[in-house]
Amino acid sequence: EGYNDWSIRFKKLKEYAKKEGAPKSFLDDIDQIETPIYAGKISKPDVLLEEGNIKNVNRNIEIIFTPGHDRTEISILDNPSQILFSGDHILPKITPFIPLEDAEDDMLEKYTSSLDKVYNLEQKLIAPGHGALIEKPYSRIEQMQLHHKKRSDKIIDLIGNSKFSGWEIVNLLFPRKLDELNLRLAFQETMAHLIYLENKGLIKHVLNSDTNYWEKVRQV
């Protein structure tokens, strides 16, 4: 319900950012966002695909549910050729953006679990949604797993023995000046990592009436 209603996404993002100490300029920028031209209305699907082999086709094709970059993301494995069509899940040069869908929805956990799932598939080549073919699929997946581990470790180190609002952590993690779009992406990506680390029991989210903040969990 409302999956492709971008106004709902923007409203949730603004509410969340305000509680994380985002400045008025950032909140005002969210109000100015227009629905992307590529985000047309989604028609009701004729067929709902389930994870597993596609039936009634003359080829061994398998649907792999790979949420993370998007909550409905799928990859498609052509078993005869062992080519994985990864969409935006695995890209050759960059790591896909992990969105802040909902404070209760751990999108980074979903993404890293999806990487683990795909790593265990028999594959010779990855055909991504953007960029060149990935000829060393397992190496690329390992690189992406390491990227998120390093970022998580860096956030833990940045917090140290202090406590910071989500917005302060964004500025620590991304110190150089970003344009409006990349600042929104950086905010959501940072929040996705914070939620992930909280669910791992490594940090905690302290909720205040004014601005929420994050701190490390004291190990006994």
Describe the residue ranges of each PLM region.
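Active-site HxH/HxHxD metal-binding segment of metal-dependent hydrolases
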Residues: 1-54
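A general structural signal for well-ordered alpha-helical segments in protein cores
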Residues: 9-10, 141, 152, 166
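Metallo-beta-lactamase
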Residues: 29-47, 60-152
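Residue-level detector of conserved, well-ordered beta-strand and adjacent loop positions
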Residues: 50, 67, 215-217
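Generic structural signal for secondary-structure transition and capping sites
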Residues: 54, 123-124, 164
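C-terminal regulatory/interaction regions
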Residues: 154-220
